[in-house]
Amino acid sequence: YKWDMGWMNDTLHYMQTDFPWRPGNYRMLTFSSMYQFNENFILPLSHDEVVNGKCSLITRMPGDYWRQFAGMRALAFYQMTHPGGKLNFMGNEIAQFIEWRYYEGIQYFLSEQYDTHRHQQRFVRHLNRFYNEHPTLWQRAFESDGFEWIDADNADQSIISFIRRGDDPKEDLVVLINFDVNAREDFRMGVPEWGVYEELFNTDNERFGGSGVLNTGKIKCQDEPWNGREQSIVVRVPPLGGMILKKTGAQRRPAKKTASSGAAKAKKPASKAQGKKAAE
C-alpha cells in the first residue's frame, strides 16, 4: 500500500480555495482518477497536515463557521466514497481548531461543550458505520471496475457524481457531492439503471449540523437521457454536501414510440375494391 500524496495535496488545495474560484480548480477533484488504480493507494489526512504552522483542517476551510463545518463534512464524505484506503489523524473527527501539538492532548471537550463539534463527531461516527455496513464502498476499492464516473465535467456548479460498484450489482451506489455553497433544487442527473431510487445518506442532515436539504421518499426515473445515460432522476442537492443513492425498486418503463409504428398508424387500410383488383 502507498499513501496517495497527490490526492491529499490536490484535495486540500481545492478545499482551501474560496468558492468563486473553485470552478477553475475543478480538475484537482478529478485528476486522481487518472492514476488511482495504478497502485494500492491510501487516502491520507494525517498528522503531517495539521502541524508546523499548516493549521488544522477546519481553519483551512473558507467561509463562516457553518460553511467551515459543512466543508469538513464534504471533505470526509469525499474521502470515504473515493476509491482507496482511508487514513485520518485524531482530532479530525471533532474538527479541532488548533493544530496538533505533541505536548498537548486532543481537545475532546469541544464535542461535549459545543454543538458544532458534537455534530461533527456524530457525522463521522455515522459515516464510518455506513462505510462498514456497505461493502460496495470497500470490496473493490483498489480495482478499476469498482468506480465509474457519471459526471466529471460540471465545473461551473462544482459538482461531481460517480458510481461505486461492489461484488453484488444490486448493491451499486450512486454518489453526488456539491462543493459549492448553493443548494440545487430540481437537479437532473443520469443514473446507471432504470428503476426507483432512494437516498441512503446525506451530509446535510440536521442531526449532523446541516441545513436539511434532503431527498425523502421514492425517486422515480424519468425517460430523459442525461450524462450519457438512457435515464435520469431529479434530486435536491445539498449545499456544501454529498449524498448517496441506491436503486431500491423496479419501475415500469414507458414504451417508446418508433417511426415505423407511427407510419403504420397513419397508413389507411386498402378498400375492398383495391384488394379485389390486386387479387386479379
Can you describe what each PLM-predicted range is?
Residues 58-69, 107-118, 229-234:
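Active-site rim elements
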Residues 111-149, 241-244:
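Aromatic- and carboxylate-lined catalytic core of secreted/periplasmic carbohydrate-active enzymes
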Residues 174, 178, 227, 240, ...:
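Acidic/aromatic-lined carbohydrate-recognition and catalytic surfaces
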Residues 106, 112-115, 119-121, 127-129, ...:
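C-terminal accessory region downstream of the catalytic core in glycan-modifying enzymes
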Residues 216-254:
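C-terminal beta-strand-rich structural cap/linker in extracellular carbohydrate-active enzymes
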Residues 1-101, 132-142, 146-204, 211-212:
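Conserved alpha/beta catalytic core and glycan-binding cleft of carbohydrate-active enzymes
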